[in-house]
């Protein structure tokens, strides 16, 4: 444990040195192995280990505007890989929930898309003996299934499309905030705390170096919003195509 703590603390003093970041990756791996060696799996360590390994691949040197274009591209690519990996975990979780819901619907069962899905799952967890904290909204969720149902559908959408957001910097801070709020709600309803994941999402997305260094407008959010923005872009391209053909004598741009 001591060696892991020392290794993970080195980048705090020497973030520009790759050796320090390699030592941190090894330290995180050792800590993850230690905490997962007691008979249960702590999934929160998985993303941290991979992110630490990716950060070890960041180029050496301080982040400055005077760095070469190749250096800055290398830095941004490595950071984007770490972001995409974390979001891929959320997307896989959402897709599995949707796939299970479709299968349950086909079998005539109350699945992920049923209005009482979240309430039933919460009630099941409470019957399992979930420890109650000082604030617990589980009884309210069970008693108001139709109020929380739209929230659960929004949760499925946020999870399933997370990996798309990794490549849309304008949405980094918004999606990071939404994911953190989801984890907080899970804690207050099911007493399952994702503190490690909250910290990682905060570092990678709320503090994303790729996100615009300004306030993002609602129009920009709508144009970048997963599926919605893609549909708007497709409709815009469909509307502009006839105009382009008319301007070019009816000859599409691709045929010229």
What are these regions (language model features)?
Residues 62-78, 216-256:
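Membrane-interfacial, low-structure loops and terminal tails that flank and connect transmembrane helices
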Residues 33-46, 187-196:
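Membrane-interface helix caps and helix-loop-helix hairpins in membrane proteins
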Residues 1-28, 53, 81-98, 145-189, ...:
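Functionalized membrane-embedded alpha-helices
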Residues 187-224:
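Non-heme Fe(II)/2-oxoglutarate
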Residues 87, 91-157:
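Membrane-interfacial catalytic/cofactor-binding modules of polytopic membrane enzymes
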Residues 48-63, 86-89, 200-212:
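Hydrophobic cores of alpha-helical transmembrane segments in multi-pass inner/ER membrane proteins
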Residues 18, 36-46, 58-69:
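Transmembrane alpha-helix boundary signature
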Residues 28-36, 75, 113-116, 185-189:
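Short edge-strand/loop segments of extracellular domains
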């Amino acid at each position: 444990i001591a060696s892991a703590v020392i290794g993970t603390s080195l980048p705090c003093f020497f973030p520009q040195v790759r050796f320090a970041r390699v030592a941190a990756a090894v330290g995180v791996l050792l800590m993850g192995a230690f905490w997962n060696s007691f008979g249960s799996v702590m999934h929160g360590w998985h993303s941290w280990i991979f992110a630490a390994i990716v950060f070890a691949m960041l180029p050496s040197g301080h982040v400055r505007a005077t760095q070469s274009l190749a250096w800055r591209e290398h830095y941004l690519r490595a950071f984007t890989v770490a972001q995409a990996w974390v979001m891929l975990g959320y997307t896989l979780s959402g897709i599995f929930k949707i796939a299970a819901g479709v299968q349950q619907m086909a079998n005539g069962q109350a699945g992920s898309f049923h209005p009482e899905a979240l309430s039933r799952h919460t009630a099941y967890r409470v019957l399992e003996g979930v420890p109650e904290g000082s604030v617990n909204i589980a009884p309210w969720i069970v008693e108001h299934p139709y109020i929380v149902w739209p929230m659960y559908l929004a949760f499925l959408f946020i999870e399933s499309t997370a990996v798309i957001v990794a490549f849309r910097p304008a949405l980094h801070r918004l999606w990071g905030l939404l994911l953190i709020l989801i984890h907080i709600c899970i804690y207050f309803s099911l007493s399952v705390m994702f503190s490690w994941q909250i910290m990682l999402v905060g570092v990678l997305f709320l503090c994303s170096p790729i996100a615009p260094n300004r306030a993002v407008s609602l129009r920009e959010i709508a144009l970048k919003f997963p599926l919605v923005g893609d549909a708007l872009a497709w409709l815009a391209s469909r509307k502009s195509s006839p105009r382009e053909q008319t301007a070019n004598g009816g000859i599409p741009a691709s045929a010229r």
